């Protein structure tokens, strides 16, 4: 799997080169996420900022740091274009097997069976970065929450995995 075969020395160099480029607020976000991962706390972190302020850059450094340390860190986005900007990124619908018509059911569910390779990957991951989550239907987040709780056998929010949601509420219509 791609998620377990990253070039770790290259990622370590990337982190060393770019950690010092983070602004004060970006470094605070980085430290907050890393602290939760290192302590195994899990958590739900939202990074809200206008476009062009470095959310994707900060997320990329966070992903690289965890992947360089043999941790599974997944990157998804609400759109294909946004997912292509994250290393190893894919759409949330593809990774979580979300139904296309989320309004069809009151409680839609992800089409992932326990014991499958993708379920195992979700069980082992320490971090999920979800870019452009402000464009995501709330039922998608609820479905992923239930999936992670089931796969990880943990009833904490998102099964205890650290969820870094990024986006810009200024781009969302009322």
Predicted regions and their residues:
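Conserved ATP-binding/catalytic motifs of P-loop helicase motor domains
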Residues: 1-174
């Amino acid at each position: 799997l791609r998620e377990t075969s990253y070039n770790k020395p290259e990622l370590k160099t990337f982190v060393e080169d770019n950690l010092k480029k983070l602004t004060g607020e970006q470094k605070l976000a980085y430290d907050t996420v890393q602290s939760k991962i290192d302590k195994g706390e899990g958590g739900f972190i939202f990074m809200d900022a206008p476009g062009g302020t470095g959310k994707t850059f900060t997320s990329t450094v966070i992903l690289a740091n965890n992947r360089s340390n043999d941790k599974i860190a997944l990157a998804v986005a609400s759109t294909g274009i946004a997912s292509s900007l994250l290393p190893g990124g894919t759409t949330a619908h593809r990774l979580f097997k979300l139904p296309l018509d989320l309004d069809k059911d009151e409680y839609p569910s992800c089409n992932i069976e326990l014991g499958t390779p993708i379920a195992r990957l979700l069980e082992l991951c320490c971090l999920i970065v979800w870019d452009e989550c402000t464009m995501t239907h709330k039922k998608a987040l609820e479905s992923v929450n239930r999936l992670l709780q089931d796969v990880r056998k943990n009833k904490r929010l998102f099964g205890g995995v650290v969820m870094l949601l990024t986006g810009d509420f200024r781009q969302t219509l009322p």
